[in-house]
Structures are given as structure tokens and as C-alpha cells.
């Protein structure tokens, strides 16, 4: 088995590092270059879509089992998952995204041993961040009471939050491992691990909830068990022979350069968190409208549909980041530019397909979620905004992937802060309450004032980018980070 993986890894490295402009010099036409780049891209995007959908499904299954226990249990688990875990998940995932820059560029430069060192540094940084974030779980009950949640929901949410702590620490290993493998084009391994974890999750949910009747604690424990199964599979594969070039064992070298690594990780975390929290603010603002129940229900349905579809652009985010980082690390600025064009174009085509689909089925898309006439009518009215949100999201995450692959995280963090919170939120508030447009005004203001402006700025930066200069910066970055361990 390991021999096969070695051959596959060797072939992947050759395919991954062969640049588009080299193909052109060999006499291949534009069509051949597009096909080659598409194959490289979808070797990352395809498994990434599967892994993300599988992980998302584990959460849905957990909430489905919780719903059979009672409304109180469902409310408690939903609050902890969406608020406490959601907050920490976004921050830690963003911090781990620094590896997409460093590992991707190091792999492109053929400095393979550095990938293992970078991953160990990420483990250290994320572990200490996890420890610092523990109060968000320990003090869940008093925080929810302070925010006005009913006492019974706040008390049970506090119990749920404590039992989610093992999941919290699973993120420490899981996120760096995923990016470590992703940058080597070993995404099929993460897909297989996610599939096994999903099967385990379904079986353990049935055993703990229906079989052993462990209630809400058993329901929460299942998600932690499933995540740790996933982590152990990835860890064993990565450290026990699956990655012989990039994993050379635990090293004291990982203890050097931690401050620089922390700064890049923090920039990545802030960049993604500002996006993640933005849409949570949308739901909170909607909850303060008149007829809030209908507004929140309809918006939640739209967000659920958008969430499923977002798995595709987020996979392109991962794929684009790796491809751009690999090409820049190899000193191929033209290849990075070509990879960006191919990725944005293909993601946009998929986005246009879903845009048309939502526009055609605007009065039917909510049937699977609700039978309430009022909710169905509200979703129908919101479907136009949903369609344009899906369309914008087919481009924006891909451009963010370009930023990650190029190491622009700190700049994008400032752009996100300005667009989302200085333009989008105030405009949403003005349109929602000032112009009395309700949830349509809030969503419209935040989408066209925040997301659209951010997308235009990122598009402008990407189009004006000097890719050869970025390749030189990548080379300097690799040499700098390599020198920190000498």
C-alpha cells in the first residue's frame, strides 16, 4: 500500500510542479494548458468538496438526533454549535490556513522537509490558542444568561459546551494535517478519512442516543468521537510512511521562528473570522425585526441552502490557494496567474448554474424545509438575494484563495474589516430599519455593500498583481523561513 502511495505521490509532484508556461514552450496550445490546469485543480477541489460536505453532514446528523430528544436539547446543541464552536472553529481554521501559504510555496520550491516543520509549528500555535479559548466553553452558561437567553437553555448549553471541549482540541491536529496533505495533492486521503468518520458518526449516534439512551451528553460526545477518528487516520497516514519526503519525524526545529509563524497565523485567522462573523451578525440583526420568527426562519432556510452550495466555492478556495502557492514557490509567476484565471472562471461558471437554478425554482426551493405558507412566501421573496449571494460567493472565496496562496492575509484582513464592518453592516442597518425594508434590506445592504465591494477590491488587486514579483517574494519568504531553523 505504501509503495502505491509513493508512486502516486511522485506522479502528483511531477504533475503539480509542471508549469503552464512550460507546456506552452513545449508547443501545447491553450486548450491543452487549460485541460492540464483543470486536472491539477480538480485533484484538489473534488476531494475537498466531498470532505467538506461530509463534515457538514456530521453536524446536521447530530442536530437531527438532538431534535428527537426534545426542543430544549436541540436548542442547546444548536446554540453551542453555531455560536461557541462556530466562533472557535472559524478562528482556528483561519490560523491553520497559514500553512496553505507556507507549505504550498515550500512544496513548489521542492523544500519538502519544511512541510513537516511548518505543520509542527502550527500544532504548537493552535494548541496554545485552544487553551486560551477554553473560557468560551467553561463560561457558556453565564454568558448566555447575560445575553438574555432563557435559564433552562443557558444551563443545558453550559453542559453541552463542556462536553464539546474534546472536539475543540481535535481542531488543533485536524486543521494542520488537512492542509499538510492538501499541499501535497493528497486530498483523497482526507476524503477517505472523512467518509470513515461519517460512517462511525452515524453508528455511534445510533448507539449512544437510541441504544444506550445517553441523552444530550451522548449526542454531543458522538461528534467529538467522529472528529478524533478522522484525526487519527490522518495522523497515522502522515507520520507512519504516507509522506516520506515531507514528514521526517518530530523536530526541535519546530520550536524556532514561532513568533513570525504566529503573526502570519493570526492574520489568516482574522481574515477568515471577519467573514465568518459577518453572516452571524446578519442573523442576529434579523432576530431584532418585527415578526422576527418568520424573518429568522426564512433567512435560516436561505443560509442553509447557501451553506450547502458554499462547499463548492470553499473547495475552490482551498484548490486555488494550493495551486497559486505551488506555482509561486516554483518561481513561476505566469503559472500562478494562469491557475488563478482557470479557477475563477470555472467557479464562476458553476455559480452561474446555481444562480439560474435558484431564479427558476425561486418559489419551490423552501419546500424541503418548511410547509408554512408564510415562511415559503418569505423565502420566495428572498430568493433573488440568495441567487446573487451564491453568484458573488462563486468568485469571492476563490480570490481569497489567491490571497492565501500569495501570502496577502494581512492586507485582506484590513479589506474585510473595512468592507464588511465599515460599509456592509451600517448599510444593512440603514436599509433594514431606516428604509424599513426588513430582512431584505439588511441582507441586501450587507451583500451589495460588503461582499460585493470586497469582491471588486480583491478583483482589482488580483488583476493588477505583478506575478513575477510575487514569485520573487515567495522565494525570499521560503529562504527566510528556512533560515530560521538553521
Swiss-Prot record:
Region Disordered, residue ranges? 1-25
Q: Does the keyword Membrane apply?
A: yes
Record's GO cellular component, any one?
Answer: membrane
What's in the keyword line of the UniProt record? Answer: Membrane, Transmembrane, Transmembrane helix, Transport
* Cystine pairings recorded for this chain: none
The record's listing under InterPro entries reads:
MATE_euk (IPR045069), MATE_fam (IPR002528)
Membrane-spanning regions, if any? Answer: 41-61, 74-94, 124-144, 153-173, 189-209, 216-236, 269-289, 299-319, 349-369, 384-404, 407-427, 439-461
GO molecular function per UniProt: antiporter activity; xenobiotic transmembrane transporter activity
| Entry membrane topology | Multi-pass membrane protein
Determine if Transferase is one of this entry's keywords. no
Instruction: Name where it's found.
Output: Membrane
Pfam families for the chain: MatE (PF01554)
According to the record, the signal peptide region is none
The biological process GO terms on file are: xenobiotic detoxification by transmembrane export across the plasma membrane
Family in the record: Belongs to the multi antimicrobial extrusion (MATE) (TC 2.A.66.1) family.
Name the UniProt record assigns to this protein: Protein DETOXIFICATION 27
Give the species: Arabidopsis thaliana (Mouse-ear cress)
| Lineage, broadest ranks | Eukaryota, Viridiplantae, Streptophyta, Embryophyta, Tracheophyta
Name of the coding gene: DTX27
Amino acid at each position: 500500500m505504501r509503495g502505491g502511495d509513493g508512486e502516486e505521490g511522485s506522479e502528483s509532484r511531477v504533475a503539480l510542479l509542471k508549469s503552464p508556461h512550460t507546456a506552452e514552450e513545449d508547443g501545447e496550445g491553450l486548450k491543452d494548458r487549460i485541460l492540464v490546469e483543470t486536472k491539477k485543480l480538480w485533484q484538489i477541489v473534488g476531494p475537498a468538496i466531498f470532505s467538506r460536505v461530509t463534515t457538514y453532514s456530521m453536524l446536521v446528523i447530530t442536530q437531527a438526533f438532538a431534535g428527537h430528544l426534545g426542543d430544549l436539547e436541540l436548542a442547546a446543541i444548536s446554540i453551542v454549535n453555531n455560536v461557541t464552536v462556530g466562533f472557535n472553529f472559524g478562528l482556528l481554521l483561519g490560523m491553520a490556513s497559514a500553512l496553505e501559504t507556507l507549505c504550498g510555496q515550500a512544496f513548489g520550491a521542492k523544500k519538502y522537509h519544511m512541510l513537516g516543520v511548518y505543520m509542527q509549528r502550527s500544532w504548537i500555535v493552535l494548541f496554545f490558542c485552544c487553551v486560551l479559548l477554553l473560557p468560551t466553553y467553561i463560561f457558556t452558561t453565564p454568558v448566555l444568561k447575560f445575553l438574555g437567553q432563557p435559564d433552562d437553555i443557558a444551563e443545558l448549553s453550559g453542559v453541552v459546551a463542556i462536553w464539546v471541549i474534546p472536539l475543540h482540541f481535535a481542531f488543533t491536529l485536524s486543521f494542520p494535517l488537512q492542509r499538510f496533505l492538501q499541499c501535497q495533492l493528497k486530498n483523497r486521503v482526507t476524503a477517505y478519512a472523512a467518509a470513515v468518520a461519517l460512517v462511525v458518526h452515524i453508528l455511534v449516534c445510533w448507539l449512544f442516543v437510541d441504544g444506550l439512551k445517553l441523552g444530550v451528553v451522548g449526542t454531543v460526545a458522538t461528534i467529538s468521537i467522529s472528529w478524533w477518528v478522522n484525526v487519527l487516520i490522518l495522523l497515522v497516514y502522515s507520520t507512519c510512511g504516507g509522506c516520506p519526503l515531507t514528514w521526517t519525524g518530530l523536530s526541535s526545529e519546530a520550536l524556532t521562528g514561532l513568533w513570525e509563524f504566529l503573526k502570519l497565523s493570526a492574520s489568516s485567522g482574522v481574515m477568515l473570522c471577519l467573514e465568518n462573523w459577518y453572516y452571524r451578525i446578519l442573523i442576529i440583526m434579523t432576530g431584532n425585526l418585527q415578526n422576527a420568527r418568520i424573518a429568522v426562519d426564512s433567512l435560516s432556510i436561505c443560509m442553509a441552502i447557501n451553506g450547502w452550495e458554499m462547499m463548492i466555492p470553499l473547495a475552490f478556495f482551498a484548490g486555488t490557494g494550493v495551486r497559486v502557492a505551488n506555482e509561486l514557490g516554483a518561481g513561476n509567476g505566469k503559472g500562478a496567474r494562469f491557475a488563478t484565471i482557470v479557477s475563477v472562471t470555472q467557479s464562476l461558471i458553476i455559480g452561474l448554474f446555481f444562480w439560474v437554478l435558484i431564479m427558476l425554482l425561486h418559489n419551490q426551493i423552501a419546500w424541503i424545509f418548511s410547509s408554512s405558507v408564510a415562511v415559503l412566501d418569505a423565502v420566495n421573496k428572498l430568493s433573488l438575494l440568495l441567487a446573487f449571494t451564491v453568484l458573488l460567493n462563486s468568485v469571492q472565496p476563490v480570490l481569497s484563495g489567491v490571497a492565501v496562496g500569495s501570502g496577502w492575509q494581512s492586507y485582506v484582513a484590513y479589506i474585510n474589516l473595512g468592507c464588511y464592518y465599515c460599509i456592509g453592516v451600517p448599510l444593512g442597518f440603514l436599509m433594514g430599519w431606516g428604509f424599513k425594508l426588513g430582512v431584505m434590506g439588511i441582507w441586501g445592504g450587507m451583500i451589495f455593500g460588503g461582499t460585493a465591494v470586497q469582491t471588486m477590491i480583491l478583483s482589482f488587486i488580483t488583476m493588477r498583481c505583478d506575478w513575477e514579483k510575487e514569485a520573487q517574494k515567495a522565494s525570499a519568504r521560503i529562504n527566510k523561513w528556512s533560515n530560521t531553523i538553521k
